[in-house]
């Protein structure tokens, strides 16, 4: 019953419930709701982010932030593009390992193959997270 809601339903304008609602968003894999659900689920799978020791990764593009988290059991890499433009970038100082993608703003064709440097791309405001088991680090 709408009369018992804490706040009134938005029934006019571009955000009205007839246009944007949870039931409809759940049907569309590319919806903002699914994006938030994916981020929340991935974040809960990797509690190291935010609490584990970390270091910034050296990147040749000022628009990209790279962070490396490390615990006794696994390592995590996160990259975020703070520019509205797509970027290609090179990151240095990443340990050689088999890295698995765990979160991204879209599907990317390139893979994280580590040597002394790593070359990747990100869409405008894009993000990519990778992880590896610590036993895989070389």
Regions picked out by a protein language model, each given a short descriptive name:
Residues 1-76, 82-88, 93:
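Loop/helix patches that line or flank the sugar-binding groove of alpha-linked glycan CAZymes
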Residues 109-111:
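Surface-exposed loop/edge segments in extracytoplasmic proteins
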Residues 113-138:
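C-terminal beta-strand-rich structural cap/linker in extracellular carbohydrate-active enzymes
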Residues 80-81, 125:
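Active-site beta-strand/loop signature of hydrolases that rely on acidic residues for catalysis
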Residues 86-107:
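Beta-strand-rich binding/interaction modules
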Residues 77-80, 101-102, 131:
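Conserved active-site loop/cleft motifs that coordinate metal ions or position small ligands
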């Amino acid at each position: 019953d709408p009369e018992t809601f804490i706040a009134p339903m938005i029934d006019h304008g571009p955000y009205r419930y007839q246009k944007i609602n949870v039931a409809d968003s759940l049907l569309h894999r590319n919806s903002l709701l699914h994006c938030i659900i994916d981020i929340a689920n991935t974040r809960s799978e990797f509690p190291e982010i935010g609490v584990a020791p970390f270091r910034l990764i050296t990147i040749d593009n000022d628009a990209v932030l790279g962070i490396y988290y490390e615990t006794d059991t696994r390592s995590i890499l996160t990259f975020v593009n703070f520019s509205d433009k797509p970027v290609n970038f090179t990151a240095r100082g990443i340990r050689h390992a088999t890295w698995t993608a765990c979160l991204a703003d879209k599907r990317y064709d390139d893979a994280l193959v580590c040597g002394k440097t790593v070359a990747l791309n990100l869409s405008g405001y894009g993000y990519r997270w990778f992880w590896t088991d610590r036993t895989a680090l070389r």
